[in-house]
Amino acid sequence: MDQLQQSLLDAPIIEKNGYHYFVHPISDGLPKLDPTLLREIVIRIIRKAELQDVDRIVTPAAMGIHISTAVSLMTDIPLTVIRKRKYGLEDEVAISQQTGYSENEMYINDVRAGERVLVLDDVLSTGGTLASVLEALDGIGAEVIDTVAVIKKVGGENKVDDAGYDVKTLINVDVVDGEVVIVDEHGDS
C-alpha cells in the first residue's frame, strides 16, 4: 500500500454543517506533511499529467500551492497561484469560488489568452473551486491542457463533471460511517 492511500485511511474525520471532511496533510496542512508523501504525490502527478508544451501550472490558493511548487521545481514549468486577495492589476479576473461549505472571491492574474496551462489542486470534492477556475481560464482564452487533483471525494454533487470538464485524480475516496474508504486506488485518468 502506498503512502497516500495509507495516510488517507489514517486520516481523522470531522463534520462541518452536515458535511464530512477528512483532515489530511495534503488538503489541510496537518498532521505534518512528510516529504516522502509529497514526493510520492509529485512523481505520480508528473507521470499522470499531460505536460507536453505546458507554459505554466495554475493552482488555487492555498492548499494547491505546496503540490504545485514541487511539480514546478521538478518540471521547470512556471507557476501562477490564483489568489484570494484582490490586487487590482490590469489583467485581473475575479471568479466566484463555491465549495461545499463556503463562497469566496478568487483572482487570476498573469494568465493570458493562448497560454497552455496545467491546473493542479489538492482535493476535488464538490467541484466548485475547479469548475470556477476552469470556466475563468476558458474565458481568458487559456488552453487547459490537463487538470489534476490529488484526491477525489466521491458521492454527491460534482460541478466539474456537470460542467463537462475532465479531471484526472491520483486516488478516489469516500467517507462512510466516519471513516475514509478507498473507492479507486488509481484515481481517474
UniProtKB/Swiss-Prot annotation:
GO annotation terms (biological process): purine ribonucleoside salvage
Q: Does the keyword Zinc apply?
A: no
A GO term for molecular function: transferase activity
What's the protein called, per UniProt?
HGPRTase-like protein 1
Presence of keyword Transit peptide = no
Job description of the protein: May catalyze a purine salvage reaction, the substrate is unknown.
Q: Keywords, A to Z? A: Purine salvage, Transferase
| A Pfam family recorded for this sequence | Pribosyltran
Q: InterPro entries annotated for this entry?
A: HGPRTase-like, PRibTrfase_dom, PRTase-like, Pur/Pyrimidine_PRTase
The superkingdom of the source organism is Archaea
Q: Where does the chain cross the membrane? A: none
Q: Which family does it belong to?
A: Belongs to the purine/pyrimidine phosphoribosyltransferase family. Archaeal HPRT subfamily.
EC number(s) from the headed UniProt entry: 2.4.2.-
